[in-house]
Amino acid sequence: MTKLSIEPVTRVEGHGKVTLSFDDSGKLDKVNFHVVEVRGFEKFLEGRYIEDAPIFTPRICGICQVSHHLASAKAVDNVFGVKIPETANMLRNLIHQASNVHSHALHFGMLASPDLMFPTTDDALKRNLLGVAGENMDMIKDSIAMRKVGQTIVQKVGGRAIHPVTAIVGGQSKPLTEEERDELLTLSDNLVETAERTLNVGKEMVENLKEKDLMNLGYFESYHMGLVNNGAQDIYEGNIRVVNSEGKIEYEFDPAEYANYITEGVRPYSYLKFLALLKRRGEGKGAYRVNTLSRLNVCDKMPTPIAQKYYEEFVKTYGKPAHQPMLFHYARLIELLSSSELIRKFLEDDKIVDTDVRAEVDPKNITGEGVGCVEAPRGTLIHHFKTDDRGIINDTNLVVATVQNNPAMDIGVQKVAEKYIKTPEVAKPHILNHMEMVIRAYDPCLSCATHTIGEEPKILSIHVCQGGKLIKTL
């Protein structure tokens, strides 16, 4: 048996690889996407006070840390049965939209654009950020500028640009001042214009894939899942909606009920869990997808006017639901524009500087369980905590976006290999890159996703030491 591997998969957050196995006759036997790191945050959180969760979970990732911060904060609010003030909710939503801008601008400008600009190039020295900069430096500058706006908002509202700290039980630890708002309004003055310009550049790049017969890389039909708020796309709050491969609504439920609809499993070749819809099995049946394209597939409309115009154009061109992985890029840019519009809307609302940002919390009012849900840049994110009557965590389940897309990435690389790589001899660099293109379209965050140990019984021991002495073993 012959094996080929792509290791590491580049331009993704975290560490992964793809292996291709060929039988003794040289024919393709199987293809798998492996994630080769383990984090274990679900175990780390056991024994911690529940109010500490929003501080610990952002450390899962340095890119989508705001999403983890807010999902945990929402869950903690539910553990204490508290409803946060309107302004606190607005501030949380603001930094979530800002983080979305940061992440989407980073992914398109730095990670995805080489695939879209040089999809058939064998030369890896050209198929990278420097190659893109040589062709369109203005696009790179725009991506950096948008990312700066997003990160600055997170820093001002969240206390830190990386790993924010202000979302606490009952609301926010501090309000936004008038001076800070004025500064952010000035900083974001051209944000919507820049996002729309980037969308038009990216839209053309994605559409050019049709000419190279690459639009259907990794294509398969599946269910799609995402949050909707009265039918509109919403990355901060709402119900979870699931549509089938034909676009029919199968389920719409409160995030707290997720365990009634989603099942989790493991496979021996990856540290990522594999998720599927309960009572649905098989390729394109049990498998479902999340992330930007899925959010467009499940919603009825966008929440902002300019993004709505592009959403309508997208649906008219590609139909609904659209299943092509390459369209995640296009959808990501529509969402980048929507988040930019919402940032301006929040900052222009005088309620954003109200000082009533924290509700009174009764420390004895512990319900023992809480679920928090947001749409992270990469898809639906659920934090589920259970506690004892003292508020100490005794069980944690993190349903992370990339985990939910894991079956899709596995199927996607298999589809590419079946079409382009019949034998090892034809595995040219740009052909192998086509498999990476499918993975990167989902913008996976592998650090976020790895929190399970494989299928066979294994023991991972973590030794916590202080002053050279062992104080705890996990």
Curated annotation (Swiss-Prot):
Induction: By selenium deprivation. One of its GO terms (molecular function) is nickel cation binding. Signal peptide: none annotated. Keywords: Metal-binding, Nickel, Oxidoreductase. The keyword Metal-binding applies. It is an enzyme of class 1 (oxidoreductase). Ni(2+) binds at C61, C64, C445, C448. InterPro entries: Ni-dep_hyd_lsu (IPR001501), Ni-dep_hyd_lsu_Ni_BS (IPR018194), NiFe-Hase_large (IPR029014). The keyword Glycosyltransferase does not apply. Its cofactor is Ni(2+). Coiled coil: none annotated. Its EC number is 1.12.99.-. The F420-non-reducing hydrogenase vhc is composed of three subunits; VhcA, VhcD and VhcG. Belongs to the [NiFe]/[NiFeSe] hydrogenase large subunit family. This is F420-non-reducing hydrogenase vhc subunit A. It comes from Methanococcus voltae. The gene is vhcA.
